[in-house]
Design a protein with these regions (language model features):
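Basic nucleic-acid-binding alpha-helical/helix-turn surface characteristic of O6-alkylguanine DNA
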Residues: 1-116, 162-168
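Histidine- and aromatic-rich ligand-binding microenvironments
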Residues: 98, 129-132
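Regulatory, non-catalytic segments
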Residues: 119-121, 126-128
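Short Lys/Arg-enriched helix C-cap and helix-to-coil transition segments
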Residues: 132-139
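…primarily DNA-binding HTH/wHTH and HhH modules…
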Residues: 142-168
Length: 168
């Protein structure tokens, strides 16, 4: 992700929510959701947080609650994320993976038209700033093992189990 200027940071708001996989810290700007962080993180509170940032946080919280209740299979949120061109192509390709399904890192590499870049795809997924919303937990190793996950393999298992139990 690109470094944010002091002015951009001042307009950022955060919210800690409790979910079935533990606490998540949501971070948003006036443009959209910037991060979903595993665990509770106390971030500096700015009096300059815009109403728009607060609105993005509220909407993200609602949609995440719907997801964990099995009532939402796809997120509809404005995102304010940045990475390299390759990272962004990998992150947005995650939206092509259906709820309750998994694909391999090699299959995701083909989705972004870089069939030999499966390791780079895994690395980009590891830097996904909005895990769950852009569902990198749905990407597994070609041999069927879970591979890695920024939130830990126990959380990846829980997310996949949740989606498999709520399919249909």
């Amino acid at each position: 992700m690109k470094a944010r200027t002091k002015q951009q940071t001042a307009m950022t708001g955060s919210k800690i929510i409790t979910t079935p996989i533990g606490k998540l810290t949501l971070v948003a700007s006036s443009k959209g959701l910037q991060q979903v962080i595993f665990g509770a993180r106390k971030l500096p509170i700015s009096p300059d947080v815009s109403a728009k940032a607060k609105s993005h946080l509220k909407l993200a919280e609602r949609q995440l609650r719907e997801y964990f209740a099995g009532k939402r299979k796809k997120f509809s949120l404005n995102l304010d994320i940045s990475g390299t061109e390759f990272q962004e192509s990998v992150w947005y390709a995650l939206n092509k993976i259906s709820y309750g399904k998994t694909i391999s890192y090699a299959q995701q590499a083909k989705l972004v038209r870089k069939p030999k870049a499966f390791r780079a795809v895994g690395s980009a997924n590891g830097k996904n700033p909005v895990a769950i919303v852009l569902p990198c937990h749905r990407v597994v190793a070609s041999n069927g093992t879970l591979g890695g996950y920024g939130g830990g393999l126990a959380i990846k298992r829980k997310l996949l189990a949740l989606e498999n139990s709520k399919k249909g």
